[in-house]
Amino acid sequence: MASKESGVVDAIRRRIAVEWPTSVTWKMHGSVYMEAGIPDVLCCVEGRLIFLEVKHLKPGESKAHAYGRTSVEQVRQIKRIRAAGGAACTVLDADEAVWAVREALNGSTLASLYPRTGGEDGGEGQAD
């Protein structure tokens, strides 16, 4: 399993390409010309655009803590994408990414996944 975020991103892109050979994925590189918080991976699978914010799970770290590292700006962008009818969520590895893509292909905006869009914390900084 890849330990750094870039390794996780590469693993996700490879896995999506294997599962859906006609898919296209892009690694979104942040820059001064790009709005803050845009998810790390954009993929087009069977005509559906899916955004994935990637967090790597550090040794000894709980999944809840890893999801909690999603920044306020990243949560805001994920909410904007979902509000527009798009699919977006935070994932920790290629297995979660494939599951999220399958859910999105079934019509989900992935709103039930982290980050939450409602609740006591407003969806920011706490996993379900």
Roles of regions detected by a PLM:
Residues 1-128:
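Catalytic phosphate/metal-binding cores of nucleic-acid and nucleotide-processing enzymes, i.e., regions
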